[in-house]
A protein has these predicted regions:
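Conserved ABC transporter NBD signature motif
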Residues: 64-72, 80
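Conserved ABC ATPase "signature" region
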Residues: 104, 108, 115-133
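Catalytic Walker B motif of ABC-type/P-loop ATPase nucleotide-binding domains
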Residues: 162-166
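A short, surface-exposed alpha-helical micro-motif characterized by mixed small hydrophobic
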Residues: 203-204
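ABC ATPase "signature
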Residues: 221-222
Length: 266
């Protein structure tokens, strides 16, 4: 492993995924250094979640490679996955388990010391404000409570790379603020965050770099100020609209409004 590769946490090279006649991700190449929070944006169906699934070993690419901390996830899946923490867009929990039982299982899968795993789990659940529910099955949990358990599971083994797909989904404002500050702290410690979201205001504030995907291809890559200069937009929201919109937004809004009201002014 050369010096440059030691500084790169994520290396995607010509990553491609085809589903029958549809190319969901087309030759995506991307290098993310250690300690960076990289926002990965795109419209619905752009290929963001498919990219994350390939990068984390949950989906086999049609072609191309994903390397995590120097380990090709296709050739060395155990070594690569041991370094990854994932919060998926639609995370599935074993809801018949309690949070304590679920996190104990996650700790076992990562070969953590049982006492250490239990102590960390207890701390996470307490900090997330759900310690009083730690011994209740998760069948009746709200979306936000489940999300807190998923985030705890992703952090439990102290991963060097975090893949987060809409991580703030369902979280209350205070917890979302804590998580955003935590991500900055982890990045300052050298961890890498691959952050997928549609909440552009958060991405603009949190991410060091923004990559925009459309129709399975990278169409922009830079920090927020560079992307604003590129499009002469005032915000990341404006950048995103300029680069990915298929029509004039005001015309689209007007058409929706007329459809809702039947063309009648209120």
């Amino acid at each position: 492993m050369n010096t440059q590769s030691k500084q790169l946490a994520v290396v995607l090279k010509d990553l491609t995924k085809r589903f029958e006649d549809t190319e969901a991700v087309a030759s995506v190449s991307l290098e993310v250094p250690r300690g960076q929070i990289c926002g990965y944006l795109g419209p619905n169906g752009a290929g963001k979640t498919t990219t994350v699934k390939m990068a984390t070993g949950m989906l086999k690419p049609t072609s191309g490679t994903a390397v995590i901390d120097g380990f090709d996830i296709g050739e060395y899946p155990l070594e690569a996955k041991a370094r990854i923490g994932v919060v998926p867009e639609t995370g599935a929990l074993y809801e018949n388990l309690t949070p304590r039982e679920y996190l104990s299982l996650i700790g076992h899968l990562y070969h953590l010391d049982q006492n250490e795993a239990e102590k960390k789990a207890e701390t996470f659940l307490s900090l997330f404000g759900i310690a009083d529910a730690s011994d209740r099955t998760m069948t009746s949990f709200s979306r936000g409570m489940k999300q807190k358990v998923l985030i705890s599971a992703a952090l439990l083994h102290n991963p060097s790379v975090l893949f987060l797909d809409e991580p703030l989904s369902g979280l209350d404002a205070n917890t979302a603020l804590v998580l955003k500050e935590l991500l900055r702290e982890l990045a300052a410690q050298g961890r890498t965050v691959f952050y997928c979201s549609h909440v552009l205001e958060v991405v603009e504030k949190v991410c060091d770099r923004v990559v925009i995907l459309n129709n399975g291809r990278i169409i922009a890559d830079g920090n927020v100020e560079e992307l604003k200069d590129l499009t002469r937009a005032a915000s990341l929201e404006g950048v995103f609209s300029d680069l990915t919109s298929t029509g004039d937004l005001s015309d689209i809004v007007r058409a929706f409004s007329e459809s809702v009201t039947g063309g009648k002014a209120e």
